[in-house]
Amino acid sequence: MLKLRLTRLGDKKRPSYRIVAMEALSKRDGGAIAYLGNYFPLEDSKVVLKEEEILNYLKNGAQPTRTVKSILVKAGLWAKFEESKKK
């Protein structure tokens, strides 16, 4: 099953994360299928997203982790996905 989840980057005590699409059973920092954005928790929770690609993966059945889903909700992308499901 395909998941949207975070991989850790950055230095010690200065984390940054990539939002990636990868198989559910792969390692946290293993090979990703696609890189979909960045999340910087120490910089006022700055988020950079590739919206069209994320929506495409969600429409095709990729499941976000709890953390990624909360990031998408804050960015307003989850509402767009829910709206597109109703059509």
Curated annotation (Swiss-Prot):
InterPro entries tied to this protein: Ribosomal_bS16, Ribosomal_bS16_dom_sf
Pfam families from the UniProt entry: Ribosomal_S16 (PF00886)
Gene Ontology BP annotations: translation
Cellular component aspect of the GO annotation: cytoplasm; small ribosomal subunit
Top-rank lineage group of the source organism: Bacteria
Keyword tags: Ribonucleoprotein, Ribosomal protein
Family designation: Belongs to the bacterial ribosomal protein bS16 family.
Organism of derivation: Fusobacterium nucleatum subsp. nucleatum (strain ATCC 25586 / DSM 15643 / BCRC 10681 / CIP 101130 / JCM 8532 / KCTC 2640 / LMG 13131 / VPI 4355)
NCBIfam families: S16 (TIGR00002)
Protein name: Small ribosomal subunit protein bS16
GO molecular function ontology, one term from the record: structural constituent of ribosome
Presence of keyword rRNA-binding: no
